[in-house]
From Swiss-Prot:
Annotated protein name in UniProt: Protein Brevis radix-like 2
Annotated InterPro entries: Brevis_radix_dom, BRX-like, BRX_N
Tissue specificity as recorded in UniProt: Expressed in roots.
Segments of this protein annotated with the region Disordered: 12-43, 57-80, 205-316
Species for this entry: Arabidopsis thaliana
Length: 374
């Protein structure tokens, strides 16, 4: 029998159409079977979790037992990135999106993670925590700061942990102050500075004495009593154990406890205390080096006997006294165990004697003083 041509064409078209439909269905099944949105979301969430963990969010926590599982999950996520990118290549081409999108996302996140781990790129949160940690460490250390009390006067303070400040050094401008002007300024403004800057005053017996600082020219301005006579401290500061540099800078001077005791109780039964007579006294031993060289042998021994004072002053303190030779001139005399006397020091009131006048007075009256009191 002859078959109908129209039927044959229809069968052929049906067979061809069914094949196309099957191919389309297979492609749709592939697209449907591809977990496009779900896997992308899960991959993104896994990468975010890895980024958060790597950025140091759990840096303060102790390492737990699940760290090995996290490493496995990371390696599994990395393998998923490579496998999913290969599986989705064909489907993304059909959908019109580039196949390199998941690869770019995965590589970008991986590069960021590597940067976080290597320290090249630090998140803002992590850098903020680091800065706060460094700031707290700096707070534990003693901080020094400088205050300009007035033009030409700079004071260096140290902030104490328990509150208040400690005075480290005082600097005077050589263009505006000489040695005597600096001492006069300090005598007049000592209490104001201590109160204004909340300076804590410590007990000399419980606090270690500071070492003499270096001045601007690199030489130690303050000499110890063992090496030679030092620049005299003002009488107001003798009880506090403070001394002064000669010109450029002033600082604390280490003085022995027996010296401070000597200033406080030096047998002034017949003579008022020096602080009540004149707030600022100077010693002839510090007037000038040339004046020292003109002193007698007994005076130089008295000036250089700081070591003996610290050793035997406790037993001999009752044998020292002060005589007022004339207004503004005070002589300290010491009686030795063998019955002889020695001249300890001569002090002049700055209100009545300048440096030149004090030196001139001593040259004129040295013989009389030795004959009268020794």
């Amino acid at each position: 029998m002859l078959t109908c041509i129209a039927c044959t064409k229809q069968l052929n078209t049906n067979n061809g159409g069914s094949k196309k439909q099957e191919e389309d269905e297979e492609e749709e099944d592939r697209v449907i079977e591809t977990p496009r949105s779900k896997q992308i979301k899960s991959l993104t969430s896994q990468i975010k979790d890895m980024a958060v963990k790597a950025s140091g969010a759990y840096k303060s926590c102790k390492p737990c037992s699940g760290s090995s599982n996290q490493n496995k999950n990371r390696s599994y996520a990395d393998s998923d990135v490579a496998s999913n990118s290969g599986r989705f290549r064909y489907a993304y081409k059909r959908a019109g999106s580039g196949s390199s999108t998941p690869k770019i996302l995965g590589k970008e996140m991986e590069s960021r993670l590597k940067g976080f781990l290597s320290g090249e790129g630090t998140p803002e949160s992590m850098s903020g925590r680091t800065e706060s940690t460094v700031f707290m460490e700096e707070e534990d250390e003693l901080k020094e700061w400088v205050a300009q009390v007035e033009p030409g006067v700079l004071i260096t303070f140290v902030s104490l942990p328990e509150g208040g400040n400690d005075m480290k050094r005082i600097r005077f401008s050589r263009e505006m102050f000489d040695k005597w002007q600096a001492q006069k300024w300090w005598a007049e403004n000592f209490d104001k500075v201590m109160e204004l800057y909340n300076v804590q005053q410590f007990n000399q017996q419980s606090v270690p004495l500071p070492t003499p600082p270096r001045s601007e020219d690199g030489s130690s301005r303050i000499q110890s009593t063992k090496n030679g006579p030092a620049t005299p401290p003002l009488n107001k500061e003798c009880s506090r154990g403070k001394g002064y540099a000669s010109s450029g800078s002033l600082a604390h001077q280490p003085t022995t406890q027996t010296q401070s005791r000597h200033h406080d109780s030096s047998g002034l039964a017949t003579t008022p205390k020096l602080s009540s007579i004149s707030g600022t006294k100077t010693e002839t031993s510090s007037v000038d080096e040339s004046a020292r060289s003109s002193f007698s042998r007994e005076e130089e021994e008295a000036d250089h006997s700081g070591e003996e004072l610290s050793v035997s002053n406790a037993s001999d303190i009752e044998t020292e006294w002060v005589e007022q030779d004339e207004a503004g001139v005070y002589i300290t005399i010491r009686a030795l165990p063998d019955g002889t006397r020695e001249l300890r020091r001569v002090r002049f009131s700055r209100e009545k004697f300048g440096e030149t006048n004090a030196r001139l007075w001593w040259e004129q009256n040295r013989a009389r003083i030795q004959q009268q009191y020794l």
